[in-house]
Amino acid sequence: MKTCGKLIFFIVLTGLCGCELNSDSNGIMVFSYGFDFSKSQDNWAVDFTDFPADTDPSAYELEFAYTERPANLGANKKSMMLSGNNHSDDLFMFMKRKITDLSPNTDYALAFEVELASNAPKGSVGIGGSPGQSVFLKAGASGTEPKQIIEDNQYALNIDKGNQSTSGQMAVVLGDISVPEETEGYALITRNSDVNADPFIVRSNSKGEIWLIIGTDSGFEGTTTVYYTRVNVIFSTSSN
């Protein structure tokens, strides 16, 4: 499967998103989903977790908008903007989308590539941690819809995403959201799952569905605002 994982990511890098490949020689089927937010929101939904349930949510300044990206990154180009003020030192801001028509109860290896705009330079210092290097980008998937729940008086996530720099069963860390040190304003960055040694495996549910999840897990006690511009996900599974 590790070899297959490398093959999948090679396909991402060579720009074959949206295609479907079927290799009869090794019994591996590979297909992909590409989401370009300059064109549409494409049924992605947004939510926030990891903050106290007994606190007025307005204090966290939680915001989502399908809106234009920062002007220096291209005029009239839309993006998914998520923003929040991390008073809890653990805010998770995420997007999710259901994928259908998969084989039921089947394991899939997934590879992720996420492009987003950040304004947090590498080496910057903030309360609780760095605005860039203490905010971790995660990607994952689950056969159960990711939802906000209340647990121990906290708004929590109902699936295991890990915590901050640690991956969980249903999500892996792709890196942080820092941009180069000399950057002024927003810049586009790309993070991918090739940083992980092992492939990410998810099992579809009995209806042949999974939910993709992309988000930031923050240890920086301040405001983080990011603009997601593109998500590519490559699936592979045995065709035997």
Model-derived features: positions:
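Short beta-strand-plus-loop segments that form exposed binding edges in beta-rich domains
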Residues: 176-181, 189-196, 213-222
